[in-house]
């Protein structure tokens, strides 16, 4: 799957920015203050949909964060959907101030994809990964490791975008989608992986090393 240099503002944000700019121009004919407020909102939306370039770690076996945000928890759990047994779950909360572009935690082939409708609880709730609307993407690395990522909608984030199809290949740190306006991203690693982050740690998508796959 191609990941050539993308615009600094994700294309999914352009309709919002365009609408707000048009409204701001029209509002100037009503009152300058209203136009200024709408122009400010347009700038905020542009900032929200920012898509900066990131230096991707290249060492073999590393797992990078799939999202910007803060680690909510790290747990050993059963994951029957794709991993097929015990797995290490890392859950990351994204506030509205974080970059919302998701990046692949590992290099591998997309062999599983599923959308699950659900609720829209606040993304910092521990149960959101089980009850909220979410989209799963499963990757198999060249070493045969199975890694699962979930994009979880939140109270405000009610639009999940996932670009790859089954059969596509992703590089480590490659963009694969986004979630709009505050959300949660989760990643399941093989149970014998080494997790290198703790709850409360700040992580950066595609850049922060959150774990190491077993040899």
Swiss-Prot record:
The enzyme class is lyase
What does the record give as the active site?
A: 183
The positions annotated as site (Cleavage (non-hydrolytic)) read 182-183
Record keyword Membrane present: yes
**Principal subcellular localisation of the protein:** membrane
**Entry annotated with the keyword Transferase:** no
**The enzyme's E.C. designation:** 4.1.1.65
Reaction(s) the record says it catalyses? a 1,2-diacyl-sn-glycero-3-phospho-L-serine + H(+) = a 1,2-diacyl-sn-glycero-3-phosphoethanolamine + CO2
Give the cofactor note text: Binds 1 pyruvoyl group covalently per subunit.
Which superkingdom?
A: Bacteria
Tell me the first and last residues of the signal peptide.
none
Cellular compartments annotated:
Cell membrane
What are the required cofactors? pyruvate
Per the record, the pathway is: Phospholipid metabolism; phosphatidylethanolamine biosynthesis; phosphatidylethanolamine from CDP-diacylglycerol: step 2/2
Residues where Pyruvic acid (Ser) occurs?
Answer: 183
Keywords noted in UniProt: Cell membrane, Decarboxylase, Lipid biosynthesis, Lipid metabolism, Lyase, Membrane, Phospholipid biosynthesis, Phospholipid metabolism, Pyruvate, Zymogen
Question: Could you state what the record's PTM comment says about this protein?
Answer: Is synthesized initially as an inactive proenzyme. Formation of the active enzyme involves a self-maturation process in which the active site pyruvoyl group is generated from an internal serine residue via an autocatalytic post-translational modification. Two non-identical subunits are generated from the proenzyme in this reaction, and the pyruvate is formed at the N-terminus of the alpha chain, which is derived from the carboxyl end of the proenzyme.
Which residues form each disulfide bond in the chain?
none
Q: Which PANTHER family match?
A: ARCHAETIDYLSERINE DECARBOXYLASE PROENZYME-RELATED
Instruction: Output this protein's name.
Output: Phosphatidylserine decarboxylase proenzyme
Q: Which organism is it from?
A: Symbiobacterium thermophilum (strain DSM 24528 / JCM 14929 / IAM 14863 / T)
Highest lineage ranks of the organism? Bacteria, Bacillati, Bacillota, Clostridia, Eubacteriales
């Amino acid at each position: 799957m191609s990941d050539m240099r993308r615009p600094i503002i994700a294309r999914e944000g352009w309709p919002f920015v365009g609408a707000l700019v048009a409204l701001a121009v029209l509002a100037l004919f009503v009152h300058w203050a209203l136009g200024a407020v709408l122009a400010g909102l347009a700038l905020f939306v542009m900032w929200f949909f920012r898509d900066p370039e990131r230096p991707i770690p290249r060492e073999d076996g590393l797992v990078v964060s799939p999202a910007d945000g803060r680690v909510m928890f790290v747990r050993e759990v059963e994951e029957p959907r794709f991993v097929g047994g015990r797995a290490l779950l890392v859950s990351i909360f994204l506030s509205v101030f974080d970059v919302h572009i998701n990046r692949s935690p590992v290099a591998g082939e997309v062999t599983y994809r599923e959308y699950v409708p659900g609720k829209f609880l606040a993304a910092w709730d521990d149960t959101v990964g089980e009850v909220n609307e979410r989209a799963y993407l499963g990757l198999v690395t060249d070493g045969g490791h199975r890694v699962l990522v979930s994009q979880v909608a939140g109270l405000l984030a009610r639009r999940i975008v996932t670009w790859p199809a089954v059969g596509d290949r992703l590089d480590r740190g490659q963009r694969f989608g986004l979630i709009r306006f505050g959300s949660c991203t989760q990643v399941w690693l093989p149970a014998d992986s080494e997790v290198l982050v703790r709850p409360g740690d700040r992580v950066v998508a595609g850049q922060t090393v959150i774990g190491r796959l077993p040899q």
